Design a protein with these regions (language model features):
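Glycine-rich beta-strand-to-loop/alpha-helix junction loops that act as flexible
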Residues: 37-39
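Catalytic core of pol beta-like nucleotidyltransferases
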Residues: 1-32, 42-47, 56-105
């Protein structure tokens, strides 16, 4: 899995802004690691694609608050999954195609 540099020209302005906003909110809520997966990570996204995020480290009591804040800030569909709850082929696919947005060192 590679680290995605959000300062490059991978995404158009509004999508980049939305991804940065989501990552910032999740960091604020205690995320230890944030992974972008799905069409945005693969590069085959459309203008209306949702933001698929896999996260580690957000306490259960903060999860829904973080999700609500992400939805309000971005005005686009956001899917946030806890990496600890993902298994099998889906987990392997995220590890293979995912791009690390943030990792607490």
């Amino acid at each position: 899995m590679e680290r995605l540099l959000l300062t490059d020209r991978t995404f158009s302005g509004d999508i980049l802004q939305a991804i940065q906003g989501v990552a910032s909110i999740l960091q604020h809520h205690g995320a230890m690691k944030i992974i972008l997966y799905g069409s945005l990570a693969r590069g085959d996204y459309r203008a209306d694609s949702d933001i698929d995020i896999c996260v580690e480290g957000i306490p259960d009591e903060n999860y829904f608050r973080a999700l609500a804040e992400c939805l309000m800030k971005t005005q686009r569909r956001v899917s946030i999954l806890d990496f600890q709850n993902i298994q099998g082929d889906f987990r392997e696919r995220i590890l293979k195609e995912g791009k690390i947005l943030y990792k607490r060192e």
